[in-house]
From Swiss-Prot:
Induction: Up-regulated by salt treatment and hypoxia. This is Glutamate decarboxylase 4. Homohexamer. Interacts with calmodulin. The keyword S-adenosyl-L-methionine does not apply. The gene is GAD4. Its cofactor is pyridoxal 5'-phosphate. It comes from Arabidopsis thaliana (Mouse-ear cress). Pfam families: Pyridoxal_deC. Its EC number is 4.1.1.15. GO terms for biological process: glutamate metabolic process.
Length: 493
């Protein structure tokens, strides 16, 4: 006699996920479910949802690394369960971080002797690195003001209006006035002359960007240093410089070694760089290094011993994974100076291919410079019928993610598209992207203008509008339209 289970008694674990009840139910969104589900079902359901994400390799908005060698992937997975802060338990991991700090500090020409340890720390990204550097500047300034018997309650920091949002966060979170140098059309970085004019006795530092997020351009740190040296002599101040090299720190030493932007300049006291950008490591790893030990106040360093040994620490968070630190060391020794230079050369060459291809269409004005971070920022020469937001939106149908955005004050009327060239963006992809841009433009040309029916002659309600006002209205319209499409879950494209 053969014994068998009926269908109703069958073990659900043998069912295909798509033959089970789990795909018939909505996924939990607000509360943890009461019952468990098989691991295969959990994986399949989540994996299916993630298919609707964009392809990271085609996300040309991001500077962040999206490809690493399989050997490095393996190293990262093998160390994914190591908590970096357990320094006594994982001393080799700590040693690898120290080696990275020393290599990066010397790459940036820190004044170190043979065998002398550099001062720096690994972070979860440049945002944390900038917070730490800013806190060091603020404490140094406060200590000096206290010693002189002067007020120390109104610190400020001078930057360009093109800074990344982490600078605004630092200013707001740590109560520092942010003094921004406004941009102007065709000059989208901080003007060193205007920056130095804004410096006063309460300025804790001037922040220069080596690789603007908006256009990839390097700010003139050498000129800023020279002007600030002169002002310090005249006033008796000692206002220092921080270089935000999040994007450019792993580019300039290899492509532009003669460019003076780092610790070769006497007023540069600290530098941050993103390992997860052109340091060629997956998100999130950043670094901040100081010129000398005296540039990092001792009172900001904590000492703990409840993990088994005395451990100095200067971070905003505590626990974090070790994988990215290990991956950074892998890249530094795997590629070496030669390898990094080759990667950056390739990025620059592919940037030029894309730049020249876009210029040949005759439809775009290139806003970015040839030197700097390998990216192309560009605007439509004629946006009277269709604008940059519409181009970016239509391009998504081909799989490409290309951002469109407006410039900061006083260049808000300028809208640009930006393509970041990363290590894994080949010449073939660059040529394909140009072809897809041409398809998008041809398609848009065959459509009626969606916005300018009322504005065809630059008039609304009988009032003549300037081109800048018209462009701002068009931009605002498209921003609102795209946000509506993103939030409307029932939209069918």
């Amino acid at each position: 006699m053969v014994l068998s289970k009926t269908v109703s008694e069958s073990d659900v674990s043998i069912h295909s996920t798509f033959a089970s009840r789990y795909v018939r139910n909505s996924l939990p969104r607000f509360e943890m479910p009461e019952n468990s589900i098989p691991k295969e079902a959990a994986y399949q359901i989540i994996n299916d949802e993630l298919m609707l994400d964009g392809n990271p390799r085609l996300n040309l908005a991001s500077f962040v690394t999206t490809w690493m060698e399989p050997e490095c992937d393996k190293l990262m997975m093998e160390s994914i369960n190591k908590n970096y802060v357990d320094m006594d338990e994982y001393p080799v991991t700590t040693e690898l971080q120290n080696r990275c700090v020393n290599m990066i500090a010397r790459l940036f020409n820190a004044p170190l002797g043979d065998g002398e340890a550099a001062v720096g720390v690994g972070t979860v990204g440049s945002s944390e690195a900038i917070m730490l550097a800013g806190l060091a500047f603020k404490r140094q300034w406060q200590n000096k003001r206290k010693a002189q018997g002067l007020p120390y309650d109104k610190p400020n920091i001078v930057t360009g209006a093109n800074v990344q949002v982490c600078w605004e966060k630092f200013a707001r979170y740590f109560e520092v006035e942010l003094k921004e140098v406004n941009l102007r059309e065709d000059y989208y970085v901080m003007d060193p002359v205007k920056a130095v004019e804004m410096v006063d006795e309460n300025t804790i530092c001037v922040a220069a960007i080596l690789g603007s997020t908006l256009t990839g351009e390097f700010e003139d740190v050498k000129l800023l240093n020279d002007l600030l040296v002169e002002k310090n002599k005249q006033t008796g101040w000692d206002t220092p410089i921080h270089v935000d090299a999040a994007s450019g720190g792993f580019i300039a030493p290899f492509l532009y070694p003669e460019l003076e932007w780092d610790f070769r300049l006497p007023l540069v006291k600290s530098i941050n760089v993103s390992g997860h950008k052109y340091g060629l490591v997956y998100a999130g790893i950043g670094w901040v290094v100081w010129r000398t030990k005296t540039d990092l106040p001792d009172e900001l360093i904590f000492h703990i011993n409840y993990l088994g040994a005395d451990q100095p620490t200067f971070t905003l968070n505590f626990s974090k994974g070790s994988s990215q630190v290990i991956a950074q060391y892998y890249q530094l020794i795997r590629l070496g100076f030669e390898g990094y230079r080759n990667v950056m050369d390739n990025c620059r060459e592919n940037m030029m291919v894309l730049r020249q291809g876009l210029e040949k269409t005759g439809r775009f004005k290139i806003v970015s410079k040839e030197n700097g971070v390998p990216l192309v920022a560009f605007s439509l020469k004629d946006s009277s019928r269709h604008n940059e937001f519409e181009v970016a939106h239509t391009l998504r149908r081909f799989g490409w993610i290309v951002p469109a955005y407006t410039m900061p004050a006083d260049a808000q009327h300028v809208t640009v598209l930006r393509v970041v060239i990363r290590e894994d963006f080949s010449r073939t992809l660059a040529e394909r992207l140009v072809a897809d841009f041409e398809k998008v433009l041809h398609e848009l040309d065959t459509l009626p203008a969606r916005v300018h029916a009322k504005m065809a002659n630059g008039k609304v309600n009988g009032v003549k509008k300037t081109p800048e006002e018209t462009q701002r209205e068009v931009t605002a319209y498209w921003k609102k339209l795209l946000e509506t499409k993103k939030t409307n879950k029932n939209t069918i494209c």
